[in-house]
Structure formats: C-alpha cells, structure tokens
Amino acid sequence: MTDCFVGIDTSNYTTSAAVCTAEGEILANLKMPLPVREGECGLRQSDAVFAHTKNLPSVMQKLPEVLRGNRVLAVGYSARPRPAADSYMPCFLAGIAAAQSFAAGAGGAPLFEFSHQEGHLMAAVYSSGAPENLLREPFAAFHVSGGTTDVLLAEPAGSGFSVTRIAGTEDLNAGQAIDRAG
C-alpha cells in the first residue's frame, strides 16, 4: 500500500485533480479546461462555477482507480486565488465542496487549504529538482497566471507560503494565455 496525497483545484480556467505519492511521484494529473467562447476574454464567475459543477464528477470518478490499493494521507485544495485575506473568487467553492466530500469518503482524511497561487509556487518548487533547497528560505518567483503577471517574494510558511508582491502589471493577457494553454 502506497501513501498518497490528493489535490483539487477549480480555477477560472481549469478543473483539476492530482494524486502523488508521499515520495513525490505523480500518479495522476487530471485537467479539464473550462469552455471559453471564441472571442471572449474569460468566464463570468457564475459560468465558471457551473462548468466546474459539470466537470468535477468526470474528474473525481477517475480518482478511485488511481488510488486502488493505496492510502490517502491528506487532501489539499485551492480555496482562493492568492494567500491573502481579501482574495476571493466563487469558482473555488466547487473545489472546496469536492475536496471536503472526497476527504470524508476517504475515511476522514485531513484537509489542507491552499491558494491557487501557492499551488503554482509549489509546482515550480518541485519541478526545480531541488525542493529541499527552495523550501528552506525565501525566493523570488515570476508568476504568470489568470489575472496576474507578478514578481513575488515567496517565504515558506507552514505547508504553504507567505507571499509578497514585489512588482507586476495589471495586464491580464499574459496570464490568460498561460492558463488557457494549460
């Protein structure tokens, strides 16, 4: 039996779930882009919530097969765009509900709340090949996603990050292009 972690994210562009082992091996990386009509700049939050509500069953139904014979140690989920008190988007409510339901069905696995931005930062840390170095001290990160194109100071804090915006633009286009490309 392998110990695993499950992650769920419902951003304004993609319904996502992932499974990784305690050693960091990715067993599943499931993504379903939300439909954005041609010529549109994005989705209204109500449309994103509706799309996630439609997508989540398809994504979540694939997890039991991936997890068969394994043990879920914890479930992490994105609850907001950034790790800030005033950061809120309704699209994350669908993922919160899915994560809470999944954790309850997985024997009451502990839940860990993160921001979407922290998910991007942690993905960059682990794909660097040297996460133990980056998780010891603050580092600068160039973050391009959805509504942001920023240079950030990321300081490891508990299981997430304390994030300070050093510089950035108000331009949505670069972040939208990255999110739509997946």
Where are the model-predicted features located?
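Short acidic/glycine-rich loops and adjacent helix/strand connectors
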Residues: 1-182
